[in-house]
């Protein structure tokens, strides 16, 4: 099991390679990364078989920025018929797993394999159970089978508590018809990713206050209002009338980068199209000056050196807040609903 297989957004294979290579260097793991542009996946091949497991046990998956999902294992070539027998033979040395996901990559070819996977899963699951390779135990690793085609599959495993919460890292979120824009799903996905579900009622509680910078027409504001959070929506553009009638929104026509609330708020959210360095400086100001307790902010990405630039900006925010003597947790992820951007979550601890 010397190979790590990583899913990603198509076009960001290079960023995944850069990030996983950086991680391997920090862990002193020799190996190399490779990816085909547009393939929606990347691989890291470790020089030593045990290093794949060491890498995955040394870091939390949620701390990675560009990978959507990961697994360690190897490729298996399948015949036209009797695929299950060949797979069982290939899995002979794998540990007993507590759950099974059949996955595909996020490309048109991958999506065409979804029907095959749905038909194949039931007989495969039955065979794995009979062979004793699959049991119902959430504490055991998850078996992740990523089909590149009907004849090639990456047979991988990952610890059930250290991988994506959805197959392929793709959330199944329903667009609310009342929301004024599809961008609303970005904020909902961010909450799922950064905030444990059991903490939502505490950290996204009715009666809290928020500022939405660059709010129009109100996709992110809608999510806040839906949880009965009072929002100051900052944008020179018009807000959806339905939100203004809700009684939870005050519209301030102002520049999102210069606006400051009269009183600290619980949340600041921002999805403004701007150079990432300027947005990063704004994040540091809001958290550093105690203007908000938590924030979800999108950083738009440059055309080149995207991983290096994100890493540089995150380090800058972290060091800037540390110099102020503040304890702030920082998370960053390219979410499924993100495009040429990443989503940052920051939470200030203490006073």
Curated annotation (Swiss-Prot):
The entry's keywords: Cytoplasm, Methyltransferase, rRNA processing, S-adenosyl-L-methionine, Transferase
Subcellular location: Cytoplasm
Listed InterPro entries: RlmM_FDX (IPR040739), RlmM_THUMP-like (IPR048646), RNA_MeTrfase_FtsJ_dom (IPR002877), rRNA_MeTrfase_M (IPR011224), SAM-dependent_MTases_sf (IPR029063)
Any Pfam family the entry gives: FtsJ
Record EC number: 2.1.1.186
Entry GO terms, CC: cytoplasm
Sequence positions that bind S-adenosyl-L-methionine: 183, 216-219, 235, 255, 271
GO MF: S-adenosylmethionine-dependent methyltransferase activity
Reaction(s) catalysed by this chain's protein: cytidine(2498) in 23S rRNA + S-adenosyl-L-methionine = 2'-O-methylcytidine(2498) in 23S rRNA + S-adenosyl-L-homocysteine + H(+)
Purpose of the protein: Catalyzes the 2'-O-methylation at nucleotide C2498 in 23S rRNA.
HAMAP family hit by this protein: 23SrRNA_methyltr_M
Similarity comment: family membership: Belongs to the class I-like SAM-binding methyltransferase superfamily. RNA methyltransferase RlmE family. RlmM subfamily.
Protein name per UniProt: Ribosomal RNA large subunit methyltransferase M
Source organism of this protein record: Ectopseudomonas mendocina (strain ymp)
Chain's gene name: rlmM
């Amino acid at each position: 099991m010397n190979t790590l297989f990583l899913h990603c957004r198509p076009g960001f294979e290079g960023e995944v390679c850069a990030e996983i290579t950086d991680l391997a260097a920090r862990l002193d793991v020799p190996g190399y990364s490779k990816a085909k542009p547009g393939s929606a996946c990347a691989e890291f091949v470790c020089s030593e078989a045990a290093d794949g497991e060491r890498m995955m046990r040394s870091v939390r998956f949620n701390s990675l920025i560009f990978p959507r999902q990961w697994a360690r294992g190897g490729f298996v070539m399948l015949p036209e018929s009797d695929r299950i027998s060949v797979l069982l033979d290939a899995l002979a040395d794998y540990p007993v797993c507590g759950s099974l996901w059949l996955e595909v990559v996020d490309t048109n070819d991958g999506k065409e394999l979804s029907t095959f996977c749905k038909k194949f899963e039931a007989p495969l699951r039955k065979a794995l159970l009979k062979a004793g390779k699959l049991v119902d135990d959430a504490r055991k690793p998850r078996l992740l089978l990523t089909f590149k085609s009907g004849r090639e599959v990456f047979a991988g495993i990952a610890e059930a508590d250290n991988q994506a919460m959805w197959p392929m890292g793709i959330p199944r979120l329903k667009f609310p018809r009342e929301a004024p824009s599809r961008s609303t799903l970005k904020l909902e996905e961010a909450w799922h990713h950064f905030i444990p579900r059991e903490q939502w009622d505490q950290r996204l509680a009715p009666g809290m206050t928020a500022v939405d910078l660059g709010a129009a027409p109100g996709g992110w504001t809608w999510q806040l209002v839906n949880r009965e959070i009072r929002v100051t929506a900052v944008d020179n553009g018009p807000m959806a009338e339905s939100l203004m009638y809700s009684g939870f929104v005050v519209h301030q026509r102002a520049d999102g980068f210069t606006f400051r609330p009269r009183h600290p708020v619980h949340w600041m959210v921002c999805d403004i199209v701007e150079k990432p360095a300027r947005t990063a400086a704004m994040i540091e100001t809001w958290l550093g000056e105690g203007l908000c307790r938590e924030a979800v902010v999108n950083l738009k990405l440059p055309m080149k050196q995207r991983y290096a630039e994100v890493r540089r900006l995150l380090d800058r925010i972290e060091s800037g807040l540390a110099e102020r003597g503040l304890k702030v947790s920082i998370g960053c992820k390219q979410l499924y609903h993100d495009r040429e951007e990443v989503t940052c979550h920051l939470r200030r601890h203490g006073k």
